């Protein structure tokens, strides 16, 4: 039995570490998963150079959800930089969950699939809050606002914008964050949450970026440069090191130019409003 799925990366509007409320939007960088199930002993991951604990746990969790006992192998291919703050773990988890469901020939509610991936991420130790907001953005597309403690989707909108991403050379894993330092700023995070609920996503992400740059001792300079170049909003994505800016055709070029002096990799993308897709083997078919 073989199944495929493709899910998307995401960028931050509000990081949920401070107050368990989160917001994020899908971006047009993809992760595809292939799951092959058989009667062998246990599930193994096969992704060169990447820890496969998370995706293996996702497959095992789906099998448990349907009360089935199979072994097999799970593989992923991705366009999303790892440990950058662009939700590579959420995309991998979502793709692995849906590919397993596809292999089984079953159906599953999208939010139930998200929750399976979130539990797997917590078990694998790759997240502080469960990253329910990131997982919803990756799975559902558009921009979402969530209560990560209750694992409840509060709001979803479509958001039509181009995105510029700055990915510094370093990597940073969410499990290494100073949680107490972030939670000391929860009152400001509450204000960002209200902005997101009211639909001011660009303003919310900018304030979020300034807040978390302070908490995580990261430079706000990319945010300031992006705003000066005409971006509608800019932020540190997740716990970094990546930054994201919402732009149009004109300001996108200007943000790229402004960021070009900072080093690192710059990617042009777009907000992804489509949901993750079961049965889609995009990156395997494209040979990426």
Swiss-Prot record:
ATP binds at residues 81-91. GO terms for cellular component: cytoplasm. One of its GO terms (biological process) is aromatic amino acid family biosynthetic process. Pathway: Metabolic intermediate biosynthesis; chorismate biosynthesis; chorismate from D-erythrose 4-phosphate and phosphoenolpyruvate: step 5/7. It catalyses: shikimate + ATP = 3-phosphoshikimate + ADP + H(+). Its EC number is 2.7.1.71. GO terms for molecular function: ATP binding; shikimate kinase activity. HAMAP family: Shik_kinase_arch (MF_00370). This is Shikimate kinase. It comes from Methanothrix thermoacetophila (strain DSM 6194 / JCM 14653 / NBRC 101360 / PT). The gene is aroK.
